């Protein structure tokens, strides 16, 4: 086991504080509408330019191991805020830096660190309650667009795109961000249910110009089995032919003579048919077939529940207004399913999602909800260069997380104003002793830090503007983009309550641990042993050959 280097008391805290400040100073320059960029060198490829706090934090490793421990703890604040709300990483870092700096000053002045921490925790619990009272619901498209714009560093096109996507696929819908191919941002929306399975035979194609199969008002046969024998399908085919409608077959597989017969029937124009494999595998396939059945008001023909294909009737078929099948995807548009049944299925899947333990399962369940509840939107980010594309994509993803958080818990006034109002509201809060009161003051002072940093990044004097904002009422604050005072909510400067709350809670949690640190332990640096470079000189002995 390697020897350890141990530091105690003030020596340890000074080193740790230096690490905290290096990381926080690098991150906080990105805060606010006039935040600056940070350039990150990569070991391969072009440098990355970013205004995303957590991306900057993740890059920082310090040479001094004690300082690095401080930096890594603040990095944890940014990561936790990012995981919880997807945004607010820079705010969380600024809050943590302020609490640690003020807290360690109090410790150096002889305060009890444990009481300080208790005071900070008390203040944060009270502040979170006040934040919830200030919060207003975020439901209309305009507010959603404003939240997206603020989070994407005042990029209005991004905010509008996200609001448009949410309007089209609903709050439960899946919105993904991809790299586009042009210079403009684009929004693609797939309405209805789409899954990644294409037609089983190109002979089903009836729109050669697009290479797709389009079926208008088809019957949909759902079978949880392989179909290889045409005999068991004949009753269904005859009934469908009589009804004069097309038929879509979704089964585990359709092969052999069954597939050949379906192709022949289609080519002769006897009945319009298309067959696709059911999406997913194993239990997930069964669940997705059931989803499609509920969406189209059909029944899954499964031998597990005693239903046989030969005895299937038109009553068991699902129906939809339109189905489009390409070689890779199938889209069912406007299923005939009962709205109440679809809603109860969505509730059931949401319940499973909340209980799921793995991220993969959660993601798949969320996709199923989206497919049932509204659809899937893809935002394609456009940019002129690779570097700009990466930077913009990260911003759009942040903005998307922020708007989701806003829809979930509502919004408060942005620009650091909500925290200042909250700090004023808890001015009368008292702890059990004087040291706890100092802890409460430390937390209240920290709540001003985000506004001060936004103002500093805009090139103004933080104290002057902070005092003016403190003297104001309600949502009155300072708009750093236009350099004027006004109602933040009317100006469209909003922060999701969840983002502000998470930033404050995680910052206080980790800063509290740092204030109560009394000892730090790390490995001693290994001494480099001198290499045996001198031994190479022995090669000269080759000259002895001349002595022979």
Curated annotation (Swiss-Prot):
Keywords: ATP-binding, Chaperone, Cytoplasm, Isomerase, Nucleotide-binding
Annotated EC: 5.6.1.7
Main location: cytoplasm
Catalytic activity: ATP + H2O + a folded polypeptide = ADP + phosphate + an unfolded polypeptide
GO cellular component: cytoplasm
Signal peptide: none
Subcellular location, record wording: Cytoplasm
EC top class named in words: isomerase
PROSITE patterns attached to this UniProt entry: CHAPERONINS_CPN60
Function per UniProt: Together with its co-chaperonin GroES, plays an essential role in assisting protein folding. The GroEL-GroES system forms a nano-cage that allows encapsulation of the non-native substrate proteins and provides a physical environment optimized to promote and accelerate protein folding.
Protein family according to the UniProt entry: Belongs to the chaperonin (HSP60) family.
Assembly, per entry: Forms a cylinder of 14 subunits composed of two heptameric rings stacked back-to-back. Interacts with the co-chaperonin GroES.
Record-given protein name: Chaperonin GroEL
Gene that this sequence comes from: groEL
């Amino acid at each position: 086991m390697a020897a350890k280097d141990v530091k105690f008391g003030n020596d340890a805290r000074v080193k740790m504080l230096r690490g905290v400040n290096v990381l926080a100073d690098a991150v906080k320059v990105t805060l606010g509408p006039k935040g600056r960029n940070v350039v990150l060198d990569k070991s391969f490829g072009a440098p990355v330019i970013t205004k995303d706090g957590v991306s900057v934090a993740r890059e920082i490793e310090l040479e001094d191991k004690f300082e690095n421990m401080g930096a890594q703890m603040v990095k944890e604040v940014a990561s936790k805020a990012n995981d919880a709300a997807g945004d607010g990483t820079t705010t969380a870092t600024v809050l943590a830096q302020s609490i640690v700096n003020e807290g360690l000053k109090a410790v150096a002045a002889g305060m009890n660190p444990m009481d300080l921490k208790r005071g900070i925790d008390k203040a944060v619990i009270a502040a979170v309650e006040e934040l919830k009272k200030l919060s207003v619901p975020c439901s209309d498209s305009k507010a959603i667009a404003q939240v997206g714009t603020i989070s994407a560093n005042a990029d209005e096109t991004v905010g509008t795109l996200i609001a448009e996507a949410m309007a089209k696929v609903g709050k439960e819908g899946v919105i993904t961000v991809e790299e586009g191919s042009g210079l403009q941002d684009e929004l693609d929306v797939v309405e209805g249910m789409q899954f990644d399975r294409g037609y089983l035979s190109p002979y089903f194609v009836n729109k050669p110009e697009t290479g797709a199969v389009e079926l208008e008002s088809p019957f949909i046969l759902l079978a949880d089995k392989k179909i290889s024998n045409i005999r068991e399908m004949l009753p269904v085919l005859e009934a469908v032919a009589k009804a004069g409608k097309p038929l879509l077959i979704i089964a585990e597989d359709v092969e052999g003579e069954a597939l050949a017969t379906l192709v022949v029937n289609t080519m002769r124009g006897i009945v319009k048919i298309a067959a696709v494999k059911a999406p997913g595998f194993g239990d997930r396939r069964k669940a997705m077939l059931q989803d499609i059945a509920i969406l189209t008001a059909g029944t899954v023909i499964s031998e597990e529940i005693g239903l046989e294909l030969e005895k299937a009737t038109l009553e068991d078929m699902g129906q939809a207004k339109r189905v489009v099948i390409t070689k890779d995807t199938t889209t069912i548009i406007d299923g005939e399913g009962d709205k109440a049944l679809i809603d109860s299925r969505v509730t059931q899947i949401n319940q499973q999602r909340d209980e799921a333990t793995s991220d993969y399962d959660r993601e798949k369940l969320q996709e199923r909800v989206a497919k049932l509840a509204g659809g899937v939107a893809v935002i394609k980010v456009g940019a002129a260069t690779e570097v700009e594309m990466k930077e913009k994509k990260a911003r759009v993803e942040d903005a998307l997380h922020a708007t989701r958080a806003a829809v979930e818990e509502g919004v408060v006034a942005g620009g650091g104003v909500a925290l200042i109002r909250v700090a004023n509201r808890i001015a009368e809060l008292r702890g059990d002793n004087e040291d706890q009161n100092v802890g409460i003051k430390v937390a209240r002072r920290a709540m001003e830090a985000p506004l001060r940093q936004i103002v500093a990044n805009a090139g103004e004097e933080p104290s002057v503007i902070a005092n003016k904002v403190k003297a104001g009422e309600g949502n009155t604050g300072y708009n750093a983009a236009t350099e004027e005072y006004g109602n933040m909510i009317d100006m469209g400067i909003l922060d999701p309550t969840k983002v502000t709350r998470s930033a404050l809670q995680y910052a206080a949690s980790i800063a509290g641990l740092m204030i109560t640190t009394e000892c730090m332990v790390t490995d001693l640096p290994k001494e480099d042993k001198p290499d045996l470079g001198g031994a190479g000189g022995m090669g000269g002995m080759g000259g002895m050959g001349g002595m022979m």
